[in-house]
Amino acid sequence: MAKPLSERFFIPHEIKVMGRWSTEDVEVRDPSLKPYINLEPRLLPHTHGRHAKKHFGKANVHIVERLINKIMRSGGSHYKVAGHFMRREHRSLNSKKVKAYEVVKEAFKIIEKRTGKNPIQVLVWAIENAAPREDTTSVMFGGIRYHVAVDISPMRRLDVALRNIALGASAKCYRTKMSFAEALAEEIILAANKDPKSYAYSKKLEIERIAESSR
């Protein structure tokens, strides 16, 4: 007679991200971002790009995987911080998900050690604080171009926050002895605490200030 599955295989009672951190108690306070921050229990945050060609498919990608994907990108030529193309320092991560995964995992360990809290919860707080609510767009009336303030969709708010967190981490370790994992952990902690030293949080304030002046 065959043995039950519980005796033949190890079945965990709780699935933890990267085998270390649970998402059960992670809370999203921003109601507009909540439907788009995927916190499903997942051991390995890697979907193999199965949502790439689906409309709004990114909403089904785990939030940790979306962060990993952001730090893998080198960015376009217009991504400039303090006059430098910061993300070009980390071309070794381009399309190398295993390396990017290890960087994020190490950053999460640093966050847990420094704050004593679940790093996924700290990441969610950082995203909420770094997601701008308003931006500007250009419209043309009578051959004259004007900048007007517009609301940002929740999906774009999330994208902008993650992009700026990745950019801020690259800026912090640019030409320094600080590792990318340490810089990423510091940027997430600063953004979660609404510290103006955070590039992502200060960028959000700048975007909203420009939008307010364009009303």
From Swiss-Prot:
Protein origin, superkingdom: Archaea
UniProtKB keywords: Ribonucleoprotein, Ribosomal protein, RNA-binding, rRNA-binding
Listed GO biological process terms: translation
Chain ranges passing through the membrane: none
Alphabetized CDD domains for the sequence: uS7_Eukaryote (cd14867)
An example Gene Ontology CC term for this record: small ribosomal subunit
SUPFAM superfamilies the record matches: Ribosomal protein S7
A GO term, aspect molecular function: structural constituent of ribosome
RNA-binding among keywords: yes
Homology family: Belongs to the universal ribosomal protein uS7 family.
Subunit structure: Part of the 30S ribosomal subunit.
Function: One of the primary rRNA binding proteins, it binds directly to 16S rRNA where it nucleates assembly of the head domain of the 30S subunit. Is located at the subunit interface close to the decoding center.
Protein name according to UniProt: Small ribosomal subunit protein uS7
Gene name tied to this protein: rps7
